[in-house]
């Protein structure tokens, strides 16, 4: 039986539009735009297209702060992914996307379809996906549910990425109690493209057919975008129908077929876009709106895998592995023949019109007819009230945290056992990071590196964000996230080019949360301007709260850099006994927001570590110069756990040791001061390296040793640790916690 849909009168009087996600004022605005009351289908279209997830209605004023232009930018925000120029007619397309709410409800499918969606965003631009990264947040690994979420999310990422044949080469994971009921799953995809092949998501040319390609439409994921735009509750776990189910093998076929169309039929392809959040309504209305055109869709022609689907369900379904193409009139047969070779369905479901209306026809009747710009462009924009949280001033005035360091080696071991610091090998070993055989630096170093076939170049890539610093001070923390990403790229031999941002925050209707969003954007913008890394794509995920408890502000920074010559590739691990160890940067007693403060105090508080962007940029440029001149054997940025953790990590891979004398007291061994790098150079390169760095705060600490022992001295203080012991703790912590 067909579903009986509510009448316009019932929608208004019973306020059914509220259940669908529209406020009273938004419903009134829709009525005024249409000059009448919307029917059920139209109400659904507006509710999903005006959700935060699709319209950015709460975050647009903040997003306008970001610098988005630069000579390296080929495509900025507004399309499926951003693209930067790497020379020789090549570009790199990349974007990060969140799938947080679905991953709490159905962690395997939530994570898997997050991967599938971001891959489609990248190949819809005309780029071949060459790598995946992720940024994950979970609660502490002390409850069965947290362990279950970690295992299932990682399995979902691996299941989809491994099956489709795209290597998962890097990422980051942090564990904090605020993520227990609000896990974050951010996936980033990087693709390679010839600049001449860049596509747009547009439907233009009056009478041109619009084609639906890929999997059939089912009832999965209806209102997924609205679901991602509201606060969570315990009952939210029941919303499994709003989570989509993915098929990576179908996506692999879709990827190859779409790239074939772009390569061989670019003369007849007008536009291409994936069906992601809000499914068919979002992709089709956006494509028409961007081109200043209208659209007429015949819902009877939409491939359906379930019986009696209504236009409402077909338009809002978020079934996976579907694309929308606009092609030139008279060429449908060629496109269908190509998709046919891949065993994929490709059908005409509508055409471009010149009236700027979005018209939906079903069984010969017009079931929706609304201005296309009203859906895709004209959602109301809210300037939310913003209030500094009381904690911020308290943190500014608080006395700095001083750690208890009676036994330095014991503290060292405890830190290396913390899951945020410990080796993530247990996680990344589940990912195929060598498929396609271009991965030059595998997971576990500062940045992942993928070779560009047919050239001497490589792409460095990383995801970063220490959300604890943002909790203390969102502006400083936002800048640190960008600076750390750039540090990771530089340490690997790359020049930072641009970022994609995954802005994960709590409920923006709370003024304190909106303040966090604004301040984080200010910090990110300042760092991007200083480091010349414009924001070229991104994603906003708000309402990451459950039962009123929100997450730390977590703007994940995905950064891509260019390694101009494969010879410049540098990793974090010491290479040779006898190499000279240097520390670049100043160490202060900065423990607020640190892993050690969390460990010893059970919570974080106080003033965030300082960041001087001018100094940061100078150190990065000098280090990159030294790397490009072939002077650097290893390079590692100092992050969580500070110098002590970075030094230990540098010894682990080759089973080496270190004998160093540091310029700071041993109680600062685990300080998290910013803008610091641990570097090793061959003795014959020491003089030239020192000359490059001579005006800066650079310290010659000592040498790499052949024995598996670390000796650290400061004046009369000395501490010795076995790297074998440290490594076994570091490697064993996560497998042990997940048991």
UniProtKB/Swiss-Prot annotation:
GO biological process: 'de novo' IMP biosynthetic process
Statement: the UniProt record of this protein carries the keyword Lipid metabolism: no
Binding site for substrate: 98-101, 120, 244, 318-320, 541
Keyword set includes Nucleotide-binding: yes
InterPro entries, sorted: PRibForGlyAmidine_synth_PurL, PurL_linker, PurM-like_C_dom, PurM-like_C_sf, PurM-like_N, PurM-like_N_sf
Catalytic residues, chain numbering: 53, 99
HAMAP family reported for this sequence: PurL_2 (MF_00420)
Role played: Part of the phosphoribosylformylglycinamidine synthase complex involved in the purines biosynthetic pathway. Catalyzes the ATP-dependent conversion of formylglycinamide ribonucleotide (FGAR) and glutamine to yield formylglycinamidine ribonucleotide (FGAM) and glutamate. The FGAM synthase complex is composed of three subunits. PurQ produces an ammonia molecule by converting glutamine to glutamate. PurL transfers the ammonia molecule to FGAR to form FGAM in an ATP-dependent manner.
Name of this chain's protein: Phosphoribosylformylglycinamidine synthase subunit PurL
Organism: Listeria welshimeri serovar 6b (strain ATCC 35897 / DSM 20650 / CCUG 15529 / CIP 8149 / NCTC 11857 / SLCC 5334 / V8)
